[in-house]
Regions:
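Extended alpha-helical coiled-coil/bundle linker/stalk regions that scaffold oligomerization
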Residues: 206-469
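Long C-terminal appendages of very large multidomain proteins
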Residues: 354-592
Length: 592
């Protein structure tokens, strides 16, 4: 059919706020399903009967049901005989093994109480030994429910010990017949890898090798709207041989920033939904063609504006809105952009050269540019809105498509300058390597914590975690307990052998005492605030309320340890040190 791509309708249904249907947001969608580590490491073991119990935990949308349904489909392909199929699981036999799946082990089903469902499901695991029966059970269940059900019942002696040790002890090795996978630890982005879940999903959407010919209907010979279509521009930009990889990696960095904020665990459902909206927005071929025919300015539907949409109710889009690259003040660049038509040769140099035949977004950008206020006395609100739309869109486009070499040469910035995180690269450097050369990062974190307690001597603040004493509040003298910096370390979280089954990239740094009695999780927002405090920044009351709760709890745990040092000062300049000597005597000295 001319001027119509049926694949777009399917992709639109993946978005959580789809106007067509949200039917493809749940369960197994074979068109966009990608093989993950879970499939590669576990599928054959399950179908060959090497695992007796597989437990999947995680959030809704993590792909638990899809994986179980894939196992069932694989079993059917191998000749399995199904005795039961319900909306909550199946029973079947394969090669002499009795299989049972349960999609949701945390809810009642068809009038049967949840505990009764679980009792029947876990029946073979009663007793004090590993079951000998040829069984394979696979269940998706809330971790809390698993704990409550198994650990509170005496009949699960053997399984109870395995569950308890798995939940309570780091790196506990389960019996070989068991596999427990927590999909909350799975990361959809990995800055170190080019085949992360994000990358694999993009490949499915883009069909760059034309194996499925998803975008054949969008060619100019098949669609008369091709040169004016934002969907074609969005897809072609990411498929472009010259700038596609750069744009893909910069979107990856934006999604990584959301991941590192830790406001929301990003599930498979979330990332599929987000990619769908960024590429396609919400409108069908017919609807977008009507908008083009009506002369609407459709700039807000281009991928770089979709990414930071300020209207949608999708949770991922809402978090992306918080890190909108258009909000970062870049005065020199903004002053330049404001007075330059987006079609000038100078503006073309700002962007990476691509091989696209059409750039319809420039028409909309130029329309906003020409409708800006004509001077400081022009108070026309519509013109002000045009100016805002023009500048915001140009900055977003520049983040994704900007030529870093040119930006660095002309404006002393690069695409990272658009992010609200000045220390984004440094944070990710440690996440990638886990290396802190010369303990420089540890020293900077220690200094920031000390400065947050209002101790301003940089040498003392770096060599000691300083925490103020509350006992001298009415005195002009300030006192600080000192804990030697060398007794602390920065490390990455360890998820043990879970990495056999899940894609993993750490989402935080851990700053802790070497004896592990006090530990602080540092996400990217807290890291940013701490680094700025180290430079002399004074956080706002809102920032303190938002980011400092965990920091305050950490300080209390540190204070529970015995300090051998107390620093005293009256003027923040001269510090006196009371320190317990090796002989047990208190020694007073003045610090430099």
């Amino acid at each position: 059919m001319q001027n119509y791509n049926p694949n777009i309708d399917s992709f639109l249904k993946i978005y959580s706020q789809s106007l067509l249907s949200t039917g493809l947001t749940r369960g197994l969608d074979e068109n966009t399903y990608i093989q993950t580590k879970l499939d590669k490491a576990l599928k054959d073991d399950i179908l060959n009967g090497l695992k007796k119990l597989i437990v999947l935990t995680g959030n809704a949308g993590d792909g638990k049901t899809a994986f179980i349904q894939l196992i069932e489909a694989g079993a059917e392909d191998r000749g399995a005989v199904f005795s039961s199929r319900t909306e909550n699981g199946c029973k079947f036999t394969l090669n002499g093994f009795e299989f049972e799946s349960l999609y949701d082990g945390s809810q009642d089903f068809e009038g049967k109480a949840n505990d009764q469902l679980l009792k029947e499901f876990f029946k073979p695991f009663e007793g004090s030994k590993e079951p000998t029966a040829k069984i394979v059970k696979i269940i998706a269940i809330n971790e809390g429910k698993l704990r409550d059900f198994i650990l509170k019942k005496k009949e699960y002696n053997w399984l109870g010990k395995e569950v308890h040790h798995y939940l309570e002890y780091d790196n506990f090795e389960l019996n070989n017949s068991l596999a427990f996978i927590n999909l909350n630890n799975r990361s959809v982005v990995d800055i170190k890898e080019q085949d992360s879940i994000y990358d694999e999903l993009l490949d499915v959407f883009l069909d760059k090798e034309n194996k499925k010919q998803l975008w054949e209907p969008c060619k100019t010979e098949n669609c008369s709207y091709a040169n004016n279509c934002y969907i074609k521009y969005n897809v072609d930009t990411f498929r472009d041989d010259k700038k596609g990889e750069v744009v893909k990696n910069r979107l990856k960095e934006i999604i990584l920033a959301v991941y590192l904020k830790k406001e929301k665990h990003i599930t498979m459902r979330d990332i599929r939904s987000l990619i769908s909206f960024i590429f396609f927005n919400k409108y069908t071929c017919n609807q977008l063609q009507n908008s083009i025919d009506n002369g609407e300015n459709l700039l807000d539907r281009y991928y770089y504006n979709n990414t930071f949409n300020d209207i949608e109710q999708d949770r991922m889009v809402d978090i992306l809105r918080q890190i909108d690259v258009a909000d970062m003040p870049l005065p020199k660049l903004e002053n330049h952009l404001y007075f330059q038509n987006p079609r000038t040769e100078l503006e073309e140099n700002i962007f990476i050269k691509g091989s696209l035949d059409a750039n319809p977004d420039l028409n909309y950008l130029e329309e906003y540019y020409k409708n800006k206020p004509e001077g400081t006395s022009d108070n026309d609100e519509i013109k002000k809105e045009s100016a805002d739309a023009f500048l915001s869109s140009m900055k977003r486009k520049m983040f994704f498509e900007g030529n870093d070499d040119f930006l660095r040469e002309q404006f002393d910035i690069n695409h990272y300058s658009f992010l609200p995180y000045k220390y984004f690269e440094r944070y990710n450097q440690f996440l990638r390597t886990g290396k802190d050369n010369n303990n420089q990062l540890r020293s900077d974190i220690v200094l920031a914590i000390s400065k947050s307690e209002k101790i301003y001597n940089e040498i003392i603040g770096k060599e000691n975690v300083c925490i103020s004493s509350s006992s001298l509040k009415k005195s002009t003298t300030k006192a600080f307990y000192g804990f030697t910096a060398a007794d602390f370390e920065i490390v990455l979280p360890d998820v043990g052998d879970q990495t056999k089954y899940i894609e993993y990239f750490p989402d935080h740094i851990i700053f802790r005492h070497v004896d592990k009695s006090a530990s602080l999780e540092i996400n990217i927002d807290l890291f940013e605030i701490l680094m700025r405090i180290g430079e002399g920044y004074v956080p706002t009351s809102i920032e303190i309320r938002t980011f400092f709760l965990n920091l305050e709890m950490f300080k209390r745990r540190v204070l529970a340890k015995r300090s051998t040092k107390v620093f005293l000062t009256e003027d923040d300049s001269n510090l006196y040190l009371f320190e317990k000597s090796k002989s047990g005597k208190l020694v007073l000295s003045i610090t430099q």
